[in-house]
Every structure is written in C-alpha cells, then in structure tokens.
Amino acid sequence: MAKRDDRSNNPERIENIIGNTLQNMDEARDYAKAHSEELSEEEKQEIEQKNERREQSIDGLREELKDEVNDQKNNS
C-alpha cells in the first residue's frame, strides 16, 4: 500500500529553504568582500551571478509558500 503524501510541513520546509538560501547569499557576499583583493573579476562575477540565481529561486519559493499556505487553509 502506498504511503500517504503528507505535505503538512511544506510551509515550514520552504521557509527553512528560503532562510538557508538567504544565509548562503549573505555568506557569499561577505566572502567576496573579505577576499576581494584575492579574487579575480571572473570569480567575483560568478559569485554575483550565483546570488542572482539564488534570488530567483527565493522568488519562486515565496510563491510556492503562498500556494502551500493557501492550500492548507482551503483544505482545513
């Protein structure tokens, strides 16, 4: 028998992912600042581009979080 799909913790899980991603962005910025003289322009650009992708992911996760919260409200 298939295990029931329990999504009750999805909002909490998504919030944790968003928080971790924001922390990674901050750490990447701090690293780039602390090592700016040691990093090549290409490395600095790679860090910046990765943070831009992280920001896009966060935007998508925030939308997913809204959907999950609304779904839970409608199903309770």
From Swiss-Prot:
InterPro entries: SASP_thioredoxin-like (IPR017524). It comes from the Bacteria. It is found in: Spore core. Signal peptide: none annotated. Its main location: other. Residues 1-76 are annotated as: Disordered. Residues 1-15, 26-38, 46-76 have a biased composition (Basic and acidic residues). Keywords: Sporulation. Induction: Expressed only in the forespore compartment of sporulating cells. GO terms for biological process: asexual sporulation; sporulation resulting in formation of a cellular spore. NCBIfam families: SASP_tlp. Belongs to the Tlp family. HAMAP family: Tlp (MF_01506). This is Small, acid-soluble spore protein Tlp. It comes from Shouchella clausii (strain KSM-K16).
